[in-house]
């Protein structure tokens, strides 16, 4: 049961962090969908770096456009590097290119982009239980649905689809 308790704590604290940042960004005019999209792009970069670090795998991301190239930067340099990374990755002729199809940065204020990157960098995502990642994703979609004033807040993402995304 110890693992379960840890998962719940991790899940709750991470959901809180991710949601808190969504609220902050919404105040800056960055919509929830844009935030989740950027989070996905950045998480992919971070998990690629973890794969290299922990398992000695070769990076799927071209040199000069990897996670460590991004986290080292601040201010406009960070925004510029992130935008160049998205552009380059969207032009790849493989799965990476598919993942980053028409990818664009929607968090153009450096301070907020840095906050998202820092939050992602503070966690080890690759070794995190798939159920935890799925639960975080699910609860954030649900919370967004509850917080939407437009009434367009229903979400019907089937659990197996979420599983496929996070595993």
Q: Model-derived features: where do they sit?
A:
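Non-catalytic, mostly N-terminal accessory regions of nucleic-acid modification and defense proteins
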Residues: 1-167
């Amino acid at each position: 049961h110890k693992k379960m308790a840890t998962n719940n704590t991790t899940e709750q604290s991470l959901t809180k962090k991710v949601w808190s940042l969504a609220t902050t960004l919404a105040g800056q005019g960055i919509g929830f969908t844009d935030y989740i999209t950027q989070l996905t792009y950045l998480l992919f970069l971070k998990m690629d770096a973890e794969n290299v670090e922990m398992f000695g795998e070769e990076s799927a991301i071209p040199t000069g456009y990897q996670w460590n190239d991004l986290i080292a930067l601040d201010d406009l340099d960070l925004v510029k590097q992130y935008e160049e990374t998205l552009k380059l990755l969207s032009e790849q002729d493989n799965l990476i290119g598919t993942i980053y199809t028409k990818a664009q940065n929607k968090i153009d204020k450096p301070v907020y982009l840095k906050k998202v990157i820092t939050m992602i960098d503070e966690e080890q995502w690759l070794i995190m239980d798939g159920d935890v990642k799925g639960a975080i994703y699910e609860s954030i979609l649900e919370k967004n649905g509850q917080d939407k004033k437009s009434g367009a807040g229903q979400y019907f993402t089937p659990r197996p689809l979420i599983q496929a995304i996070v595993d």
